[in-house]
Structure formats: structure tokens, C-alpha cells
Swiss-Prot record:
ATP binds at residue 336. Homodimer. It comes from Escherichia coli O6:K15:H31 (strain 536 / UPEC). Belongs to the class-I aminoacyl-tRNA synthetase family. MetG type 1 subfamily. This is Methionine--tRNA ligase.
Length: 677
């Protein structure tokens, strides 16, 4: 049956750019990729995009801990994430970042439209403030007990146990993540998105029948409890986009994160030189289909805030949300101590990607059910299904075809009715892929594999091969087996991309969905090479042990400069702004009589002279060598009276001390008096 080609935009939830991809993440990306690959096989135009979610407090905090800028950290993390997804053959058309110019422009556009349409409200709120650090505490700077389900150790914006959202002030017994202090209340003006104005629209969207039943039921609970205005602003310090005309106020990460879907697609369109498609996919009356694959922990944001934001800013809403559950390993939550918190990169050091893709696919359905990765069952299932049923079907027939018939298949099918049984299954299997009933699709395919192997067992080509005058029968039987293998691999192509490549090389033909209607008759195949190797529990044991070792390494004491000289307590931007750093020319440098540590420096600030005592003598035994150098000094440090005179500032140097002191110098071109910003 010929299908009308559709235009489809598919996204996965944006991985947060402060940690590595693990097997929990991979469930979603594999699920989406299998669905996308099936859609492409059916001739649809699919754009599959993702990006790193690169803003927010956790990223800012982790970058501080690492002693690098947030920009540097998210850049390195993006490369790591893309390498992992490529390793699992996730076929993204584009992978971008929310920290991009496209995302900034779209975030500001959506905000301005919401504001123009009256959906942004300003009001002063009482906000938690850290009295020890002298700073307002954004959501992720606060932890406490969830006000809804009473789960402890939850962040200040949403509960990771029950999924509820709330303000940090609603937490029970809140504590500052930064200092551990009990926060106090301070007033601050914030911006709110008027979500209740969209209640009627959202309820109609819920009743449309498109959403999964479990999602629709959960949304109904939220409607019954009443929708609240949503705080979309955060106070500095915050890593993100500053709100236009609101100095010191930033878009909350959950405002610009879903806009990252649009930003990544805009980036893709720009790369293609296609200025039309973005509007075709995102305009209000778009006929393109838009699907978000997400985990059940972020349904609230995607089912309420996101469609309301789009509606209020005159963009189209998603066609549907495809929500999945969590991953457990061996029946329990992934555990670092047990070695079952497994990173994607660690997996690929021990197993191929197709094995996990197959196992997850075999267990997935359209429901929001958790998936258990039982490692022993994983080994048994991959060996039983991929190796014994599918690959073995090719290997047990290919030898005879290659050796006895120079790789040429028979000109007629030995059992046309059996072949028709296989091709007739395309409708049921295709519908299962389409509706995300992946487990059902795999069961149907494996049932066919059993039929194919039973046919070969009954025909016993190894016996026929020894009988005189039965060459034609042998060729027909083995050709039938190879044709059935071709159909099976075509059905499995969305799941097993690397095995498919090897199968296509052997079969000497591309596997296409419609192509199976015509069997390979009189066709020459290539010499058979091993398509897939068996796996065993020793590999699992090595994988688990490697994961444990990674945890130990991550928990090991910091070595190097940070171990001896850890990063100081966090300061606010206002604190830092008080320090006036200037470029200074060293006009003179000399020993200080009576001191074996100090040098007396005469500094020129471009019109003003300063006398500074600096404890760098051990590193610079010849002070004359410093004369004429430019350095950096703290110019507004209060003068300090010393035994040898008054020191009118401080020069900047790095290093642990002793002979390992390194005076800082600006790049060529900096002039005395220039401010360091």
C-alpha cells in the first residue's frame, strides 16, 4: 500500500550538559532513532534533531568546581555527548546547544510575543537568600523536603520523585546548597508566565485523544488541582540568557530549554541554506508533524508550559508527546556502587551498540513503563535471537551457495507460499513500529525467524548436499533460506544499523521496505563473512567492574594544584566587581634590605606611580630582569603599612610558592592603566 509522504520533525529531550550520557539516557535516544529509521524507510521526510541543555545553576556550579568557564565546560560536554550518540548510531540530522545565538533570538522573540499579548506578569516575590554568601538562591541552589510527597533532598524547582513543580519557598526545611546555611527571605522582582490563561486550550488538547492515556490522566490531575503562574526569571548569578531590558534577571532554564528544539532546527535550516522550512514546520497552521520523545520525569514541562508558550507566541503545538519510563538494571535502580550505573562510552568499550539497541527495542511499548536491563537475560536474548535465529539462518545457507553455486541464488522460490507469509507480515510489523509497540514488532519478527529455521531444519540442506543429482534442490533450499534472512533483516533494519550494513554487503543489495515484495532470484551474493559474534557473561563482568573503577576514580582525591590549593568559597559578581585590576609597567625592581622574600616594585599605571612590596624574590633572584615588563595589579587595594614602607597595591602571580611563582603578564598591546575586565 502506497503511503503519502509526510513531513516529520522529531526531537529527543535535551541532555543536560553537566554530565556524561548513561544507559538511562540511551533508552530514549534508541527508541526515537528506531522510530525515525522506520519512518525514513517508508519514504517520509524526517528531520531528527537534538541539542545539549546548557544553561542553569548546576552547570555554573560544576564549572566553578572544575575551575573553568561554563562555556568551556559545555563545549567539552557537547563533544562527548555527540561522540556517544554517534557510537550508538543515533541518526541525528543536527545536534546543537541551547547556548546558541539561534536559541537566544528565539527565546527573546517568544518572550516578547508573550509580553505583548499580556501573558507576562511582574510582581515582587519573597525569595530565599543565603545570608552567609550574600546572594539570592536560584532553584538549584536550594534543597529540602518536597512539599507534595515529602521526599527529602529535592531541588527547589521540582521533585525528582513525584514530578511536582513548586517554588523554592515551598520546600520544607530548605538549606543552601552553596553554604549549608538556612536561607532567609528577601524581596525580588520576578517575571511570571500566565499559565492559567491557557487552561481551556490545554484541556482541549488533552481531550483530543492524541496523548498517551497515562499522560492525559496525569494532566487531568494537574487541572483539577489548579494551574499556577510560572516564574520564568532567575536572579544573578545565573548562567543563561539575560532577559531583555531587565539587568541582572535571566530566563529560567526551563523557558529556553524546549525552545532549544526550535533553535537546533533553525541551525539545521541555516546550514542547508533553507530559510523556508523553519516557518513551514513551526508556523501556527503547519501541516508538518512534530513529535517529542521524553522521559516521564519532564511531562509537566512539556505537556503544560511548552504548548502554552507556543500557543501564546503564535507558534504551532506538538503533534504528540511520546513518553517513556526509566531504566533499571538487574531489577534495581542504577547503582554506582554495584557497577550498574553504566556510561554509554563504557558500554561501547565492552559491547557493540546493536546489542543494546535490540534489547531495549524488544522490551519497549507505547506505554510509560520502566525497562529493566537484566544483564544475564541480555546475554541470553542477544545470543538466542540475533545470533542463533537471524544470523545463523544466513550462515547455514551461504556456505553451500558460495561453494557450490558461485554465490548465485536460484531463479525460482522453493516455497512461494512461505515467502508470502513473510512479506504479508509487513503490515502488522510496520504498524507495530509506527505505533511504538516495539516489543510486539520484535516478537512477530522472531516468530518468522523460527519459521525460517524450521524450514531449513526440515529441508536439511546438509543432507541434500551429499545426495547425487540434487544440486538444483540444494540451490533452491539455500536460496530460500537466504531470501527469508533478507526479509527478516529488512524488518530489523531500524533496530540494527551496523548488522544491516554487513547483511547488505553480503546480500549485495540494499534492504528497503518495499523491496521485499520481489525476492532475490538469479542474484549473486558476496562471499559470506561472520555477521555477528556471540557475547558472554565475562564481558558483562568486565563491564560492571569497569563501571565500578570509573566511580572509584571519580571519587578519588583531587590531585594537582586544586588538591593543595582548593577553589575558594563562591563570591557574587558584585563582590568581584569591587576589585579593580589594572595593567602596570614595572619601572623599577630591587631587593628589600632586611627581607629575604620581598622585592620593591615601582609601578607605572599610566600617569600614576605606585610603590608595591611583593613576596616574589625567590622566583626572581635578578630583579633587574623584571624592569620593563607589564604585569597585572590590584589597584584599589587599601594601602598597607609595612616595616619597610607602605605598599600601595598587589601584583598578580600564580603558582604554589617558593621558586614556582609566575608573575602574570597581559598580551602584547595592553597599556599601563588599562582595566582588566
Amino acid at each position: 500500500m502506497t503511503q503519502v509522504a509526510k513531513k516529520i520533525l522529531v526531537t529527543c529531550a535535551l541532555p543536560y550538559a553537566n554530565g556524561s550520557i548513561h544507559l538511562g539516557h540511551m533508552l530514549e535516544h534508541i527508541q526515537a532513532d528506531v522510530w525515525v529509521r522506520y519512518q525514513r524507510m517508508r519514504g517520509h521526510e524526517v528531520n531528527f534533531i537534538c541539542a545539549d541543555d546548557a544553561h542553569g545553576t548546576p552547570i555554573m556550579l560544576k564549572a566553578q568546581q572544575l575551575g573553568i568557564t561554563p562555556e568551556q565546560m559545555i563545549g567539552e560536554m557537547s563533544q562527548e555527548h555527540q561522540t556517544d550518540f554517534a557510537g550508538f548510531n543515533i541518526s541525528y540530522d543536527n545536534y546543537h546547544s541551547t547556548h546558541s545565538e539561534e536559541n537566544r533570538q528565539l527565546s527573546e522573540l517568544i518572550y516578547s510575543r508573550l509580553k505583548e499579548n499580556g501573558f507576562i506578569k511582574n510582581r515582587t516575590i519573597s525569595q530565599l537568600y543565603d545570608p552567609e554568601k550574600g546572594m539570592f538562591l536560584p532553584d538549584r541552589f536550594v534543597k529540602g523536603t518536597c512539599p507534595k510527597c515529602k521526599s527529602p533532598d529535592q531541588y527547589g524547582d521540582n521533585c525528582e520523585v513525584c514530578g511536582a513543580t513548586y517554588s523554592p519557598t515551598e520546600l520544607i526545611e530548605p538549606k543552601s546548597v552553596v553554604s549549608g546555611a538556612t536561607p532567609v527571605m528577601r524581596d525580588s522582582e520576578h517575571f511570571f508566565f500566565d499559565l492559567p490563561s491557557f487552561s481551556e486550550m490545554l484541556q482541549a488538547w488533552t481531550r483530543s485523544g492524541a496523548l498517551q492515556e497515562q499522560v492525559a490522566n496525569k494532566m487531568q490531575e494537574w487541572f483539577e488541582s489548579g494551574l499556577q503562574q510560572w516564574d520564568i526569571s532567575r536572579d544573578a548569578p545565573y548562567f543563561g540568557f539575560e532577559i531583555p531590558n531587565a539587568p541582572g534577571k535571566y530566563f529560567y532554564v526551563w523557558l529556553d530549554a524546549p525552545i532549544g528544539y526550535m533553535g537546533s532546527f533553525k541551525n539545521l535550516c541555516d546550514k542547508r541554506g533553507d530559510s523556508v522550512s523553519f516557518d513551514k514546520y513551526w508556523k501556527k497552521d503547519s501541516t508538518a508533524e512534530l513529535y517529542h520523545f521524553i522521559g516521564k520525569d519532564i511531562v509537566y514541562f512539556h505537556s503544560l508550559f511548552w504548548p502554552a508558550m507556543l500557543e501564546g507566541s503564535n507558534f504551532r503545538k506538538p503533534t504528540n508527546l511520546f513518553v517513556h519510563g526509566y531504566v533499571t538494571v538487574n531489577g534495581a535502580k542504577m547503582s554506582k556502587s554495584r557497577g550498574t550505573f553504566i556510561k554509554a562510552s563504557t558500554w561501547l568499550n565492552h559491547f557493540d551498540a546493536d546489542s543494546l539497541r535490540y534489547y531495549y527495542t524488544a522490551k519497549l511499548s507505547s506505554r510509560i513503563d520502566d525497562i529493566d536491563l537484566n544483564l544475564e537475560d541480555f546475554v541470553q536474548r542477544v545470543n538466542a535471537d540475533i545470533v542463533n535465529k537471524v544470523v545463523n539462518l544466513a550462515s547455514r545457507n551461504a556456505g553451500f551457495i558460495n561453494k557450490r553455486f558461485d554465490g548465485v541464488l536460484a531463479s525460482e522460490l522453493a516455497d512461494p507460499q512461505l515467502y508470502k507469509t513473510f512479506t504479508d507480515a509487513a503490515e502488522v510489523i510496520g504498524e507495530a513500529w509506527e505505533s511504538r509497540e516495539f516489543g510486539k514488532a520484535v516478537r512477530e519478527i522472531m516468530a518468522l525467524a523460527d519459521l525460517a529455521n524450521r524450514y531449513v531444519d526440515e529441508q536439511a540442506p546438509w543432507v541434500v548436499a551429499k545426495q547425487e543429482g540434487r544440486d538444483a534442490d540444494l540451490q533452491a533450499i539455500c536460496s530460500m533460506g537466504i531470501n527469508l534472512f533478507r526479509v527478516l533483516m529488512t524488518y530489523l533494519k531500524p533496530v540494527l544499523p551496523k548488522l544491516t550494513e554487513r547483511a547488505e554487503a553480503f546480500l549485495n543489495t540494499e534492504l528497503t521496505w518495499d523491496g521485499i515484495q520481489q525476492p532475490l532470484l538469479g542474484h549473486k551474493v558476496n562471499p559470506f563473512k561472520a555477521l555477528y559474534n556471540r557475547i558472554d557473561m565475562k564481558q558483562v563482568e568486565a563491564l560492571v567492574e569497569a563501571s565500578k573503577e570509573e566511580v572509584k576514580a571519580a571519587a578519588a582525591p583531587v590531585t594537582g594544584p586544586l588538591a593543595d590549593d582548593p577553589i575558594q568559597e563562591t563570591i557574587t559578581f558584585d563582590d568581584f566587581a569591587k576589585v579593580d585590576l589594572r595593567v602596570a609597567l614595572i619601572e623599577n625592581a630591587e631587593f628589600v634590605e632586611g627581607s629575604d622574600k620581598l622585592l620593591r616594585l615601582t609601578l607605572d599605571l599610566g600617569g600614576e606611580k605606585r610603590n608595591v612590596f611583593s613576596g616574589i624574590r625567590s622566583a626572581y633572584p635578578d630583579p633587574q630582569a623584571l624592569i620593563g615588563r607589564h604585569t597585572i595589579m590590584v589597584a584599589n587595594l587599601a594601602p598597607r603599612k609595612m616595616r619597610f614602607g607602605i605598599s600601595e597595591g598587589m601584583v598578580m602571580a600564580a603558582g604554589p610558592g617558593g621558586k614556582d611563582i609566575f608573575l602574570l603578564s597581559p598580551d602584547a598591546g595592553a597599556k599601563p592603566g588599562h582595566q582588566v575586565k
